[in-house]
Amino acid sequence: MNTFVYLLFMMAVGALIGGMTNFIAIVMLFRPYEPIYIFGKRLPLTPGLIPKRRRELAEQLGKTVVEHLVTPEGLRRKLTDPVFVAEVADWGREWLKRWLSRRETPAQLLERLGVHAPDEWLSELAAKQAGRAYEQWSETWRLRPIRDLLSPELKETMESRIESLADYLADRVIDYFSSEEGKRQIAGMIDRFFQERGMVGGMMQMLLGNVNFVDKVQSELGKFLRHAGTRAMLARLLWTEWNKWISYPLAAVEEMIGRQRIKETVSAAARGLVRNNDWLDRPLAELIAPYERELFDRFVPQAANAAIHALSDKIEGIVGKLGLADIVRNQVESFSLRRLEVIILSIARRELKMITYLGALLGAMIGAVQGIIGLWL
């Protein structure tokens, strides 16, 4: 019985010493927070390990986060994950729905963005952009013939209407000369014709009679313009002029009309298009309504996917610019030692307790061995 009590006592003492040793070692990781001096001499192991190595701990944590935890590769995998992309698209749809539900007009949106008199600002912007776009387009195409500027469909459409244009012009000329004003024009031309012939012309005019001659010329002119051969000739003339015109370079057209004048016309058209439209005062939801399905089903997912891939392509630079290591280091250094202790203990409390218990177990085993040796000796 005495032997058993003796061994139990040795194990208890060993467990107490082992457990307390490990407990004190764990406490000394954090405590004391400040160095302790006795008679001007700093006590060894003060301050504790973590307070003493706080800066190095912060730097190592920052490096660990950047090099092993929050890496560009890991962020890229997360960004390009189909589930995440779908979630971003859903978020985009929800945001767009909320935004459209406010019934905000383009004018109100521009005013909220700091634009005063949105209609004037937008019309001038459209005019400048249209003028600039024409200049850039002209610089690219001004030495090319006009036929190269026309799409095949437009060229075919215009050429298919040349014969009908010839008929239209002939009919309009007939209508004009059949009118009273046309008759006066014919009479005037006949009078000038005879006057230019002097006495002979006057005698001819007296013999023929002006009115009957006007009717005769008017009738013959109508027959001439209605004749199929005349219209075919007019169509050939239009074809010749058309082919000549489309062979001119754009620069020649600009020279005839004036490049600045063309630019001003384009700018004025763009300005008028904005000013003479009420879309600035209509709700965005109403303007987008015809395209809402395509906007939500196609545009938003495509925009989300494009934005995510653009972000993914630049992720290394973004991570570098963010300076995650510095952020972690500064954050850890800003923690109070008490808070740092609480954070570490909240993470490793169970493991630290197990270390204390392991020390007690090892102490008990050592005490038992010592007791057995003591009894044997």
Curated annotation (Swiss-Prot):
Keyword Transmembrane tagged: yes
Keywords from the named record: Cell membrane, Membrane, Transmembrane, Transmembrane helix
Compartment list: Cell membrane
Main localization of the protein described in the UniProt heading: membrane
Topology relative to the membrane: Multi-pass membrane protein
One cellular-component annotation, GO: plasma membrane
Superkingdom per UniProt: Bacteria
Transmembrane annotation, as ranges: 7-27, 357-377
Family: Belongs to the UPF0754 family.
Protein's name in the database: UPF0754 membrane protein GTNG_0550
Organism this protein belongs to: Geobacillus thermodenitrificans (strain NG80-2)
Upper classification of the organism: Bacteria, Bacillati, Bacillota, Bacilli, Bacillales
